[in-house]
Amino acid sequence: MAHPLVPQIIDLATPVAEELGLEVVGVVFHTHQSPPVLRVDIRNPQQDTGLNDCERMSRALEASLDAAEIVPDTYVLEVSSPGISRQLVTDREFISFKGFPVIISTTPPYDGQQEWIGQLIRRDEITLYLNQKGRVVEIPRSLITKVQLDERR
């Protein structure tokens, strides 16, 4: 379950990223560490996300977070690029990665399996469509816990 501050952090980070020509693709707040680590994953839609993108976002976001005083205590801010092994979350990502190999996790298991591997066809409001060696598998979205790009292929 996401930390309760994550939605507020996303609301704050998104316009900061957009101003820099970047996109926020994920936020995780690891509070089990001391000090806690706030990780913000970004993407540069125009080119490969580089260290310069992460540094610019880190400086801008740190200033915004400090001014907003959302996080009450000391924390470490990490800004990074999720890379190819990332999870797919947004409709835009599902469209962008159509045809790519993915790993789908379901809970409870669907049709006797908890992990599905194949090529992403598409998803709609109810179903995700996966190509497994020419066979179309329709997995209910309500059972899907994670869709991740398969970097092994």
From Swiss-Prot:
Keyword terms: Cytoplasm, Ribosome biogenesis
This protein's GO CC annotations: cytosol
Localization in the cell: Cytoplasm
One family name in Pfam for this protein: DUF150_C
InterPro entries hit by this protein: Ribosome_maturation_RimP, RimP_C, RimP_C_sf, RimP_N, RimP_N_sf
GO BP annotation list: ribosomal small subunit assembly; translation
Main subcellular location of this protein, as a coarse class: cytoplasm
Task of the protein: Required for maturation of 30S ribosomal subunits.
Family: Belongs to the RimP family.
Name of protein: Ribosome maturation factor RimP
Source organism of the structure: Nostoc punctiforme (strain ATCC 29133 / PCC 73102)
Source organism phylogeny: Bacteria, Bacillati, Cyanobacteriota, Cyanophyceae, Nostocales
Gene name linked to the record: rimP
